[in-house]
Amino acid sequence: MAKSTIQESVATGRRKQAVSSVRLRPGSGKIDVNGKSFEDYFPLEIQRTTILSPLKKITEDQSQYDLIIRVSGGGIQGQVIATRLGLARALLKENEENRQDLKSCGFLTRDPRKKERKKYGHKKARKSFQFSKR
């Protein structure tokens, strides 16, 4: 099997139920999310800015890399944060010297909060049924 000449970094990010796989390779700045363009999948500017913030921190010119993102599960905001974490981890694989910059901005921190399970005898995870003393 021939070795590929394209050097790429692959990393995974998670948030709640969202899982994102990010492929980072040298290129012209093309971003592909689940077969769609970046602007189509994430229509809000704040979402795109959040995702690309690790890349802006490391490089001045964002057109150095092509991104291929596969994301599934969760809601849009969970997918945004999962993709940001995946991109930060891919940049870290690309160059280990970036660790201090990424860590100081909190891009390498995985948010551990998940949905709390529903308990029996309760309506929801913490909400109880109405209590009647008499």
From Swiss-Prot:
A cellular component annotation (GO) from this entry: cytosolic small ribosomal subunit
Skewed-composition ranges (Basic residues): 115-134
PROSITE patterns: RIBOSOMAL_S9 (PS00360)
Region (Disordered): 97-134
GO process annotations (BP): translation
Domain of life: Bacteria
Family as reported in the entry's similarity comment: Belongs to the universal ribosomal protein uS9 family.
Name listed for the protein in its UniProt record: Small ribosomal subunit protein uS9
Species whose genome carries this gene: Chlamydia pneumoniae (Chlamydophila pneumoniae)
Gene behind this protein: rpsI
